[in-house]
From Swiss-Prot:
NCBIfam families on file: PRK09489.1
GO CC annotations on file: cytoplasm
InterPro entries registered for this protein in UniProt: DNA_methylase_N6_adenine_CS, Mtase_sm_N, rRNA_ssu_MeTfrase_C, RsmC/RlmG, SAM-dependent_MTases_sf, Small_mtfrase_dom
Keyword annotations from UniProtKB, A to Z: Cytoplasm, Methyltransferase, rRNA processing, S-adenosyl-L-methionine, Transferase
Record has Cell membrane as a keyword: no
Subcellular location: Cytoplasm
Similarity section: Belongs to the methyltransferase superfamily. RsmC family.
UniProt protein name: Ribosomal RNA small subunit methyltransferase C
Main localization, broad class: cytoplasm
Length: 342
């Protein structure tokens, strides 16, 4: 994190207004402005583990990663600066949670790119903190209001679920494929064979659907699931529990918190971070897999057909094969051999 996002650059146009403010930053925190902003006090709350990693180096205990904010996260703050994400239900979940903890009268700022749908903030907060647009620049909007009424927030009411092949999939706002199985994961699932054994790592696990489906017809498999997203981690735990399955689930920035080696790594890696296209996670996944696969272990991923993963797979493992494809997606497989670059 170094260069500021367009949303942060819009905020910096108003930096003089915040010198006496005690600010809680939340939402889609794509840079380190919360650590560098000149104000009386700065805290941050994030649901994204990689954002917490970057900010905690400078902010220490003043930034927290979790599914929901708690009273201690907003303590003494008189201002909320919320970075609008591209996912509207995620924004609603986070704003209702945070504003339920803040006292009436606090300043509420919402900033985001126009293409992210930041305009939705006005109707969303109309009953709680009526907003006015105070700036428009860098294809972003900045909105301000004061909290007039605290919303009610209950985590239980935000859970949703759907069924696939007799499995119950539990989801939360902000989890990939919240409303049903995506086409890419469906294609990857079609390649998984029954009676798989050994240790399997599911990177970017989302709601846990890949692992749950695999374990349902491979009872001897030992599952480990990880994701950068706090909602995804909680959803995966809930999915496993709902189906009587066992597995270790934790937050990790690709392999950052992963220990040991596995017989198979499966993933539907993201290629967006917020509004930005980013292949970083997938590249880290492919190049790092050699340090987390047993000899003969395999990496199996699904990706949009236009993404340049074959080149990275060949550079890292020496070869790859396409084991399933549609017009839009391909499932790539490669194996840990002596020629892999460790």
């Amino acid at each position: 994190m170094s260069a500021f996002t367009p949303a942060s650059e819009v905020l910096l146009r108003h930096s003089d207004d915040f010198e006496q403010s005690r600010i809680l930053f939340a939402g889609d925190l794509q840079d380190d402005l919360p650590a560098r902003f000149e104000c009386a006090a700065s805290r941050a709350h994030t649901q994204q583990f990689h954002h917490w990693q970057a900010l905690s180096r400078q902010m220490g205990e003043n930034v927290r990663f979790s599914l929901v904010a708690q009273a201690s996260d907003v303590a003494d703050c008189d201002t909320l600066i919320y970075y609008w994400p591209k996912n509207k239900p995620e924004a609603q979940f986070q704003l209702m949670n945070i504003l339920s903890l803040m006292p009436v009268g606090v300043d509420v700022f919402v900033v985001g790119e126009n293409r992210s749908g930041v305009r939705s903030a006005e109707p969303m907060l109309a009953d709680y903190a009526p907003l006015n647009k105070v700036d428009s620049a860098r294809r972003c909007g900045l909105y301000h209001g004061r909290l007039e009424k605290q919303p009610q927030f209950s985590l239980e009411s935000w859970w949703a679920e759907y069924s696939i092949d007799g499995l119950t999939i539990k989801t939360l706002p902000g989890v990939f494929s919240r409303d049903g199985l995506d086409v890419g994961s469906q294609l990857l699932l079609s390649t998984l064979t029954p009676h798989t054994k050994g240790k399997v790592l599911d990177v970017g696990c989302g709601a846990g659907v890949l692992s749950a489906a695999l374990a349902s017809h491979s009872p001897k498999v030992r599952l480990t699931l990880c994701d950068v997203s706090a909602p995804a981690v909680e959803a995966s735990r809930a999915t496993l529990a709902a189906n009587g399955l066992e597995g270790e689930v934790f937050a990790s920035n690709v392999f950052s918190e992963v220990k040991g080696r596995f017989d198979m790594i499966i993933s539907n890696p993201p290629f967006h971070d917020g509004m930005q296209t980013s292949l970083d996670a997938a590249q880290t996944l492919i190049r790092g897999a050699v340090r987390h696969l047993n000899s003969g272990g395999e990496l199996r991923i699904v990706a949009n057909a236009f993404l340049p993963y074959p080149k990275i797979l060949d550079e890292t493992f020496g070869f790859h094969e396409v084991i399933a494809q549609t017009g839009r997606f391909k499932v790539y497989r490669t194996v840990m051999t002596r020629q892999a670059k460790k």
